[in-house]
Amino acid sequence: MSAGSGLKHEEHNVGDEDVNFLQIWIEPKLQNVMPRYQRRFFPKDKRKNKLQTIVSNEEGQEHCWINQNAKLSLGWFETNNTIEYKLNPLNKGVYVFVMEGALKSGNETIGRRDAIGFWETDTVTFTTEQESEFIIIEAPINH
């Protein structure tokens, strides 16, 4: 979703079952642009042991577009897989959020519903300690 010049937004769970989702807000590159909304379905089996881009600033049919030099990727990896993620030269920050499982980067283990940030690096490497689902959020960082 690109709000353009602003929006009012509410979320309500009208059902009886618990809902788990992430709501991620990224500041736009350009302000006051035409509002835009996209919806895509990302089957889990399409990302087994690989990263699947779900949001990017590049137009495409396989992911949603964003008005920012940002990229969001989902991963679903079996135990003992090593993932090496190379950052876009325009970006200087990556945030990895673990939805299920556990990842290890250096001496740090990141468990379920935990996250870690990386900046001032070109590559991020981590290993799955168990079967894991996670999202990588790459975006410009202003220091």
Please tell me what each predicted stretch does.
Residues M1-H143:
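Jelly-roll (double-stranded beta-helix
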